[in-house]
Amino acid sequence: MINAKKLMKMAKKWQQRAALHRKRISFQRSSVFTSSSSTVEKGCFVVYTADKIRFAFPISYLSNSVVQELLKISEEDFGLPTEGPITLPFDSAFLEYLVKLIQRRMDEDTEKALLLSISSARCSFQPQEQQCSTTQQLLVF
């Protein structure tokens, strides 16, 4: 897992690179929102899903281990973006579900199960010779 300090540094670097080509305008505060606007509220970071939906999260979400794992997976799959947004290899429905779990302050067991589910699902998309040795589990809440 990535420690919080390194993750904050990575997020700041991504934000700075993304901000080079756009102006920032403040708007009403919201904890998580989707938008087609190219501006982002101060104290938030933006990610895009695999289906091109834009999500803005408060920086405080970076301390959540599930969000850290998603960013780590994104970095492994897509690398650090030099130009353009951070893209997560998940669809918007999954990210909306994850946001609801985070907002409800999921307990430690749920968080561990979600992390296991993410890594299992990720392994199932790899070629047969590179598959992980973990067994797949279905996560239902």
Curated annotation (Swiss-Prot):
Signal peptide: none annotated. It holds the Pfam family Auxin_inducible. Coiled coil: none annotated. Expressed in hypocotyls, cotyledons, petioles, young rosette leaves, apical portion of inflorescence stems, stamen filaments and petals. It is found in: Cell membrane. GO terms for biological process: auxin polar transport; auxin-activated signaling pathway; stamen filament development. Keywords: Auxin signaling pathway, Cell membrane, Developmental protein, Growth regulation, Membrane. One of its GO terms (cellular component) is plasma membrane. It is a peripheral membrane protein. Transmembrane segments: none annotated. Its main location: membrane. May promote auxin-stimulated organ elongation, such as hypocotyls, stamen filaments and petals. Belongs to the ARG7 family. Plants over-expressing SAUR63 display elongated hypocotyls, twisted inflorescence stems, and increased length of stamen filaments and petals. This is Auxin-responsive protein SAUR63. The lineage of its organism: Eukaryota, Viridiplantae, Streptophyta, Embryophyta, Tracheophyta.
